[in-house]
């Protein structure tokens, strides 16, 4: 497996919750005992048990931090992978 595939794989293993707890801890709001939303987007629901998020008002969702960064924060894929690799460096 090449370096880029390892970087992408490591980034894909980071959950939305891990990303938000690290970079935006004040943004998470517990909605129920199983779900969170964010202070900025109350229709964006995160379910930690399965790793999914869904932003109901925008009709987008995903299951990892790359999806969140590209679909919610508008970051390009390469920048998202680079940022997440800072959290989980590839050996």
Question: What positions do the PLM features span?
Answer:
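N-terminal structured subdomain of primase-like DNA metabolism proteins
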Residues: 1-91
């Amino acid at each position: 497996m090449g370096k880029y595939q390892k970087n992408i794989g490591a980034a894909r293993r980071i959950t939305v919750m891990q990303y938000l707890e690290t970079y935006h801890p004040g943004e998470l709001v517990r909605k129920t005992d199983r779900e969170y939303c964010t202070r900025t987007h109350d229709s964006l629901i995160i379910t930690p048990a399965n790793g999914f998020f869904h932003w109901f008002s925008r009709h987008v969702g995903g299951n990892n931090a790359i999806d969140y960064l590209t679909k919610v924060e508008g970051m390009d894929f390469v920048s998202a992978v680079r940022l997440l690799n800072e959290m989980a460096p590839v050996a």
